[in-house]
Amino acid sequence: MTALNRQMRALVLDSYEEGTAFRDALINLPSPSAGQVQVKIFASGVNPIDYKIRQGIAPYAMPELPAVLGTDLAGEIVAIGDGVADFAVGDAVYGLTGGVRGLQGTLAEYANVDAELLALKPKN
């Protein structure tokens, strides 16, 4: 595993109240845990569940605040946690991660993602 303890930029939500804006913040970037890969995020989609979480109307998925929301991503693997054999540093991937129930979301420069939730980007 490559240790990458540093900071990254992220959009952080501090309140579910209507009219509350996301805050551009520097947050800690921990190394990936076992079974995870760290992805440098190139693109993050807006999934319908993201909108519901932001509005505070998806109690089954809402993280404790402050939180980084976002569930979908595309990017490149920059570090690999213990026990991950199907990916390598430099692999282009897409998939989903966090943004729900305390898992960091994709509205950030990087995310530590469960490797089972990712796929390799097709060559074509």
Describe every region a protein language model picked out.
Residues N28-G45, I57-G99:
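Glycine-rich beta-strand-centered segment in the early N-terminal region that forms part
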Residues D86, T97-N124:
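NAD(P)H dinucleotide-binding glycine-rich loop of Rossmann-like/cofactor-binding domains
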Residues E17-F22, P48:
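Short N-terminal binding/cap micro-motifs at the start of the first secondary-structure element
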Residues A25, D91, A108-E109:
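Extracytoplasmic/periplasmic beta-strand context in beta-sandwich domains
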